[in-house]
Amino acid sequence: MIIFTITIIVMMLATILSKKTITDREKSSPFECGFDPMNYSRLPFSLRFFLIAIIFLIFDVEIALILPMILIIKTSNLMNWSMTSLFFIFILLIGLYHEWNQGALEWNN
């Protein structure tokens, strides 16, 4: 409880001491030698590509979790290992089916 209280006090002090003033707002605006920017600084980004990249990262992490299971087979019971492996792969396939069913894997809309 004491640690929680100290943490809250430190967070409140940090918030109070780090408040930006109105004059600091100009520091975050784009500046090109005193002129307004000639073009928009952010490029458009495909939302479909972002979604595919996130799905790839999720499945990549799951595959990285499957790889150590090969080393575990030597030290564990074969039945427990096979049930765990099948359950994990089943969850992977359910996730893939869900993404496919929702249309997240289709590039053209």
From Swiss-Prot:
Domain of life of the organism encoding this protein: Eukaryota
A molecular function (GO) term: NADH dehydrogenase (ubiquinone) activity
Database matches in Gene3D superfamilies: NADH:ubiquinone/plastoquinone oxidoreductase, chain 3
EC number assigned by the record: 7.1.1.2
Subcellular location: Mitochondrion membrane
Membrane topology, record value: Multi-pass membrane protein
Catalytic activity from the UniProt record: a ubiquinone + NADH + 5 H(+)(in) = a ubiquinol + NAD(+) + 4 H(+)(out)
Protein's UniProt keywords contain Transmembrane helix: yes
KW tRNA-binding (keyword) present: no
Major location category of this protein: mitochondrion
Transmembrane intervals: 2-22, 52-72, 78-98
One Pfam family this sequence matches: Oxidored_q4
Family annotation (InterPro entries): NADH_UbQ/plastoQ_OxRdtase_su3, NDAH_ubi_oxred_su3_sf
GO CC, any one term: mitochondrial membrane
UniProt KW keywords: Electron transport, Membrane, Mitochondrion, NAD, Respiratory chain, Translocase, Transmembrane, Transmembrane helix, Transport, Ubiquinone
The protein's role, per its UniProt record: Core subunit of the mitochondrial membrane respiratory chain NADH dehydrogenase (Complex I) that is believed to belong to the minimal assembly required for catalysis. Complex I functions in the transfer of electrons from NADH to the respiratory chain. The immediate electron acceptor for the enzyme is believed to be ubiquinone.
Family statement: Belongs to the complex I subunit 3 family.
Protein name: NADH-ubiquinone oxidoreductase chain 3
